[in-house]
Amino acid sequence: MPAKQAESDGLADRCKLRCRRSWGKCGLKLLHLLQPDPFNSCSVVDGIGADYLPPAVGSVKGVEDSETVVSDVYSRFERPLIVYSADRHNAREYLHDVETVSFGNESRWENNISFPTHHSFQSPQAASFRLSANPLQIPQTSFIIRF
């Protein structure tokens, strides 16, 4: 096995263990692993297996005020976030066990977007919505947030 592949496999195992320790069955399917993000969470690309997640029960599209919508959704569902870009060339997902989440490609964003996260598993349901990026920063780019 090539050294790079072995390193990726080892990192995938560590991410799985971290998610399992923090959240139990976190519903993560690791694909095309990236290096860990600055929040020391599991970072992967290209999507999550739908069979690993509960069905989505809510959707909001064309959102401009992300903090308002995220707060509203969290007040109903209170789930950890999985964030990834709808642009597959920059697709990246974050699972965070921290108080804030930031996302965006540093080379294309003037400022990252951040908002509060919650760690409650009181609800077994999941929700998803599409978050449109600020058109002054990344025209025609959107993000999909699932938790």
UniProtKB/Swiss-Prot annotation:
The name this protein carries in UniProt is Uncharacterized protein AF_1962
Native source organism of the sequence: Archaeoglobus fulgidus (strain ATCC 49558 / DSM 4304 / JCM 9628 / NBRC 100126 / VC-16)
